[in-house]
Amino acid sequence: MTHVLVRRQGQGKKRRWDVNMTMCFFLFFFVFYVSFQIVLSSSASVGYSRLHLVASPPPPPPRKALRYSTAPFRGPLSRDDIYGDDKRVVHTGPNPLHN
């Protein structure tokens, strides 16, 4: 007795269609999940908190307020006292060719 397997015409196509739909569903779910994670991570980043949650820094003071008062400095009255006897000596390092 010989057994002959008879395949119906529409059964193979339906199974293939079910597999394709399942794969499309999981692919869509995966893309949706990844994009949702990207949105969540970008909203929790420093840029979002700086723009939305943290108060902005105070504005800079006006231009005239930036000047600082300094104590007056006066050097010696004669220019010869600045260097003293050492004014004509050329200081060189270990190699006199490289000043």
From Swiss-Prot:
Modified residues (Hydroxyproline): P94
Family stated for the protein in its record: Belongs to the CLV3/ESR signal peptide family.
Keywords (A to Z) from UniProt: Developmental protein, Differentiation, Glycoprotein, Hydroxylation, Secreted, Signal
Species of origin: Arabidopsis thaliana
One BP annotation, GO: maintenance of root meristem identity
Source taxon at top rank: Eukaryota
Segments of this protein annotated with the region Disordered: 77-99
Glycan-bearing residues: P94
Biased composition (Basic and acidic residues): 77-89
Coiled-coil region list: none
Stretch forming the signal peptide: 1-21
Full protein name: CLAVATA3/ESR (CLE)-related protein 17
Gene Ontology cellular component terms for the protein in this record: apoplast
Taxonomic classification: Eukaryota, Viridiplantae, Streptophyta, Embryophyta, Tracheophyta
